[in-house]
Design a protein with these regions (language model features):
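Noncatalytic, beta-rich nucleic-acid-contacting surfaces in large DNA/RNA-processing enzymes
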Residues: 1-286
Length: 286
């Protein structure tokens, strides 16, 4: 789900257990801000010092909270602006001592004042609302139209999808994920692959599966929804680019190949390596 798909944001969901839209907005602010979550709001929430909705997630939270505590609206705005730009943290807000005194006069908790002083950058709530609304809509499809969701995700977002690595059962996927996790020297390519493998693992746990690539039915670049799963495209074969995939789909039209060699001669933008990989993936079984 966009906004909440990295390990960092998924752990944030585990730590906060959100139950309403407003909390999701705070989490969006936490993840897009600088020095807002780690070493700041997370510690306050985990320790029980404050709830998610009491901490600072977005710029607007500061001004609205300070006004609700009785501070002058203009001063509340100035504090918000200084904090969200990192001026307080950087020691460039000359009025900060006076503002602190004023906040204490209005019973603003010390933990809140200390939290403000740690912030380097704050996200605007309007942007958080737009992002979370988008994520919420996509989450609906993930729950209620899962195959449409996964087909779109793998077609557009999963650039690291490798049929040889990803089209396996749940146990094999889990082992591969652990293998990459435990490899301190894992490459950037392997890290990207692991993110895709995690979604494939989830896909399998939900009772779906990947069908073998089919030289007659597979699309060039998009995953096709089938009765119980997805049919991977030609571009999911390692090293097989979009140009060769589109050429293959065009040249197979109206054909009924009698051998692998005939297919290879017809679809001549595919290398022998591609043909061998397609054979290993069961693409010629039909």
């Amino acid at each position: 789900i966009p906004e909440f798909n990295t390990r960092f944001t998924r752990q944030m969901l585990v730590d906060t257990q959100p139950k309403d839209f407003n909390t999701l907005l705070r989490l969006s602010g936490f993840s897009h801000g600088t020095d807002v979550w780690l070493g700041n709001a997370k510690d306050l929430i985990v320790s029980g010092t404050a709830s998610v909705l009491e901490t600072v997630g977005c710029r607007d939270d500061i001004m609205l909270y300070l006004i609700s505590m009785g501070l002058d609206p203009k001063m509340s705005f100035k504090i918000m602006e200084a904090v969200r730009k990192g001026k307080v943290k950087g020691g460039k807000a000359g009025d900060w001592p006076m503002w602190v005194e004023e906040m204490r006069k209005h019973d603003v908790p010390e933990w809140y004042i200390e939290s403000l002083a740690k912030i380097g950058y704050l996200f605007p709530k309007a942007h958080a609302v737009a992002y979370v609304m988008m994520a919420f809509r996509i989450a609906w499809f993930k729950v209620h139209e899962p195959l449409a969701f996964y087909a779109t995700f793998f077609s557009i977002r999963a650039k690291a999808f490798d049929a040889a690595e990803c089209c396996k059962d749940a146990d094999a996927l889990r082992r591969r994920i652990r293998e990459i996790e435990n490899n301190k020297d894992a490459t950037a390519v392997e890290q990207d692959l692991m993110t895709t493998l995690e979604v494939c693992y989830e896909f399998c746990l939900r009772g779906f599966h990947f069908e073998p690539i089919d030289i007659y039915r597979s699309d060039a670049t998009k995953f096709v929804v089938t009765e119980n799963g997805l049919l991977p495209p030609f571009t999911s074969v390692r090293g097989l680019g979009e140009t060769a995939a589109l050429d293959t789909v065009e040249k197979r039209k109206g054909k009924d190949f009698t051998s692998v060699e005939e297919f290879s001669l017809c679809c001549n933008k595919l290398s022998q390596t591609h043909i061998d990989q397609l054979r290993a993936l069961g693409a010629f079984a039909g």
